[in-house]
UniProtKB/Swiss-Prot annotation:
Segments forming domain HTH myb-type: 1-56, 57-106
Self-association state and partner proteins as the record states: Component of the precatalytic, catalytic and postcatalytic spliceosome complexes.
Residue ranges: DNA binding: 29-52, 80-102
Matches recorded under PANTHER family: CELL DIVISION CYCLE 5-LIKE PROTEIN
One Pfam family linked to the record: Myb_DNA-bind_6
Entry's Gene Ontology BP terms: DNA repair; mRNA splicing, via spliceosome
Protein name, entry field: Cell division cycle 5-like protein
CDD domains referenced in this protein's UniProt entry, alphabetically: SANT, SANT_CDC5_II
Principal place of residence: nucleus
Record keywords: Cell cycle, Coiled coil, Cytoplasm, DNA damage, DNA repair, DNA-binding, mRNA processing, mRNA splicing, Nucleus, Repeat, RNA-binding, Spliceosome
Length: 800
């Protein structure tokens, strides 16, 4: 079966084409197409230049681009390859957009001719014919003539065998680095490397033989290196004057301090440091205020977040009225006096009527005249794109000019701004646009008076015609009156506005925050200062209510009731679940549990008395300050009555400790009694409670110590391991030091022994040398004696 090339491009084919272009470039299309069995070289080239090239613009067409396209299509008809680079699009994109614009104009003309709607409005160029009415939509069985300009078809989950084979072959070829060309390149690279190594070996051998071989410098000893020195250059001598400015100007590194710096470093280098310092100071002030003056910080925050202090929407600021109330009143009176059918004339004022002033009457008449005329409107902007497309459609449908007759009706459109005007700018000629002046009287053939009389007659005739036309105008059907409203419209408050969910949520969060701040602001001073809380309510004797004669008891009763009300309110608003009653008044022996043991409250006793103290009064800051002032004044009065200084804090604490030691706590009865009035059973009960309490403290302390030990092991585990390693290294180094010290002492002793034995060995060697010298001298003498005897014997033998 013959393989027909072409068709829709697939995603795998696009990817293969991209990789092949990366390897083979943009000129070897035959080699690139050999990787794609279903595509020809021309199709591969068209696919790259029409779709895959990253420089192709695929966004929506702008108005300027459409104007430029239509203008260039009129100048270069059917020359899309020439128009495409000027517009910044591909040729197929330009042709497709041009045809769509013509189709849009044709559709509008068909609707107008067919009586369709759309005569009152203008259609924009962004609307395109879609659906079944699009003439370029592919039907069933149609073949896309330009598949290179369409998006790629996605890869199926199950690919065909042919596609898999093409993909595997392309992978193998594109990843092949062992072909003939690659082998030849590798062989050439190896030969070049071998040549370089041989040259280095030769140079090394020549250098070892004392010959400096440098082929680059051969034949260049007598020439100048212009990059390093200047021929025949003589350094100028120092003159009589200093030239620091010229040296600074010619300095190559004069801008080194400027290069590489940011704008903030040049303009204001310390701005960031100052800003950071100010932020740190602001944070420190805020943290100090949180520690030392928390109520003030809470009050300031609540004031800033309060709904009353929030920024309200400002009222509408209108300009001052041109007519005052008196002017409007005069106009309304004038309308009432003249009646509805007077027509606004200036005559006919009845008895008791007063005439309107002349200037104001003139202004009213002029206003009425202006109201009768049509209002000035902004002229509608012409759709240049659609008009240009209509012109091109008319030109394309026009008959040949050889037949003669009138040409197509083409409207003039201004040149778009995106197209450069080829006409050069010239100096304007002011005389060319002036009205021609009248000829000189000496050169005129007729008298000027005749023309003046004729012009005057024409002006009078036109004036009379205008007056007659004005008289024939119909009577007005609509009359306008100016009346003041009886009631001014009320400005709606911001609360009537409908809020969205986000604004409702924000306001709910603000209300919750204000409530929480209100609770914190109205808590007792005991909780504000984090002091020990009361365990239970103070007992009140009901017999005191009947004792009206004793004012002191009544005052104490009121104070106790108020204290119980405050305790009940604090326990309900800020509850504390960890309740363990104590046998003593305080637990100063344990600072960590100081507040926790004092926060113990008997819930049962409090809940029973909640109904008595439900009505809790909230006081303002002014009332609280006034009460505090009264208490301070009373304290000062007591000081003056005592006429002696108040006891010190240590004396007060000693007195309190002495009083506390006289009382014991009974957990079953939940009260304190004097130790002198307690029996044996109550003492045992108190001691048992103290024992249990101490045992609980020990358990809690042990658990805390275990947890702290675990945390310390986590935090200090690495340091402990490192310290153990360092200690081990120190021990090893100390052992080495001891071993080195022992070896040193051994070598010192060995040196001393060697120095002593060396003298003995030297003496023995010297003695041996002396003995050897004596032996040699004796042997030399013996040798000389024997040599003489030999010579004598030779002489004797020679005689015989």
């Amino acid at each position: 079966m013959r393989n027909v090339k072409g068709g829709v491009w697939k995603n795998t084919e696009d990817e293969i084409l991209k990789v092949a272009i990366m390897k083979y470039g943009l000129n070897q299309w035959a080699r690139i197409s050999s990787l794609l069995t279903r595509k020809s070289p021309a199709q591969c080239k068209a696919r790259w230049h029409e779709w895959l090239d990253p420089s192709i613009k695929k966004t929506e067409w702008s108005k300027e681009e459409e104007e430029k396209l239509l203008h260039l299509a009129k100048i270069f008809p059917s020359q899309w390859k020439t128009i495409a680079p000027l517009v910044g699009r591909t040729a197929s994109q330009c042709l497709e957009r041009y045809n769509r614009l013509l189709d849009e104009v044709q559709r509008q003309q068909d609707n107008e001719n067919g009586g369709g709607s759309g005569g009152g409005g203008t259609t924009t160029t962004t609307t395109t014919t879609t659906g079944e009415n699009d003439p370029r939509r592919l039907r069933m069985g149609d073949i896309d003539p330009t598949p290179e300009t369409k998006p790629a078809k996605p890869d199926p989950i199950d690919m065909d065998e042919d596609e898999k084979e093409t993909l595997s072959e392309a992978k193998a070829r594109l990843s092949n680095t062992q072909g003939k060309k690659e082998k030849r390149k590798f062989r050439e690279k190896q030969l070049e490397e071998a040549r370089r190594l041989a040259f280095l070996q030769k140079k090394r051998e020549l250098k070892a033989a004392g010959i400096n071989y440098n082929p680059k410098k051969k034949g260049k000893e007598k020439s100048w290196d212009i990059s390093k020195e200047i021929p025949f250059y003589l350094k100028p001598k120092a003159g009589f004057y200093d030239v620091p400015d010229e040296e600074l100007r010619d300095e190559p590194n004069k801008d080194a301090s400027f290069i590489g710096k940011r704008v903030d470093q040049i303009e204001n280098p310390n701005y960031l440091q100052r800003q950071e310092k100010l932020n740190k100071l602001e944070d420190i002030k805020k943290s100090k205020k949180e520690i030392f003056n928390l109520p003030q910080l809470i009050s300031e925050t609540s004031k800033s977040n309060d709904v009353e202090h929030s920024i309200k929407r400002t009222k509408l600021q209108l300009p001052e009225p041109q007519l005052t109330d008196d002017d409007i009143q005069e106009i309304s009176d004038y309308e009432k006096l003249n009646g509805s059918g007077s027509g606004g004339g200036s005559g006919g004022v009845g008895v008791g009527e007063f005439p309107l002033p002349a200037p104001r009457t003139a202004s009213i008449s002029s206003t009425a005249a202006n109201n009768n005329t049509n209002n000035i409107r902004t002229p509608m902007k012409q759709d240049t794109i659609m008009s240009e497309a209509q012109n091109l459609l008319a030109l394309s449908n026009a008959q040949t000019p050889l037949k003669g007759g009138a040409g197509p009706n083409v409207s003039q459109t201004p040149l778009p701004k995106s197209v450069n005007n080829s006409t050069p700018f010239r100096t304007p000629n002011p005389l060319a646009n002036q009205t021609p002046t009248q000829h000189n009287k000496k050169q005129s053939l007729n008298d000027s008076n005749e023309f003046a009389i004729e012009d005057k007659f024409k002006r009078q005739q036109g004036k009379n015609q205008l007056l007659s036309n004005l008289k024939n105008l119909p009577s007005p059907t609509i009359e306008y009156k100016l009346e003041l409203p009886s009631e001014l419209p009320t400005i709606e408050d911001d609360t009537t506005l409908e809020l969205d969910n986000s604004e409702i949520h924000i306001r709910e969060q603000q209300q919750l925050k204000h409530k929480e701040q209100f609770k914190l602001r109205n808590r007792s001073t005991v909780l504000k200062r984090n002091l020990p809380r009361s365990r239970n309510l103070f007992p009140i004797n009901k017999n005191n209510n009947n004792n009206n004669n004793n004012n002191i008891n009544q005052d104490e009763l009121r104070i106790l009731k108020e204290i119980n009300r405050i305790i009940s309110h604090d326990n309900k608003t800020f509850p504390n679940d960890s309740i363990t009653p104590s046998s003593t008044f305080d637990d100063d022996d344990d600072d960590d549990n100081h507040h926790h043991h004092h926060d113990d409250i008997d819930n049962n006793s409090i809940n029973d008395n909640d109904e008595k103290y439900e009505n809790y009064d909230y006081f303002t800051n002014t009332e609280l300050e006034f009460a505090d002032k009264l208490i301070r004044d009373e304290i000062e009065q007591i000081k003056q009555e005592l006429k002696q200084p108040l006891p010190s804090s240590n004396e007060i604490l000693e007195e309190i400790d002495q009083i506390r030691s006289q009382f014991i706590y009974l957990p079953k009865e939940n009260q304190f009694i004097e130790k002198s009035n307690a029996n044996q059973t109550q003492l045992i009960e108190n001691l048992q409670f103290e024992y249990d309490k101490t045992l609980n403290k020990i358990k809690n302390s042990s658990m805390k110590s275990v947890n702290l030990e675990k945390k310390l092991n986590i935090y200090n585990g690495g340091y402990q391991n490192r310290s153990n390693t360092i200690i081990k290294n120190i021990d090893d180094m100390f052992d080495q030091l001891e071993q080195s010290e022992i070896e040193y002492q051994c070598f010192v002793a060995l040196k001393n022994n060697e120095s002593i034995q060396m003298e003995k060995r030297l003496k023995s060697i010297e003695n041996q040398v002396y003995d050897q010298c004596e032996i040699e001298s004796r042997l030399q003498q013996k040798y000389a004696q024997l040599l003489n005897e030999k010579n004598l014997l030779k002489k004797k033998l020679s005689i015989f």
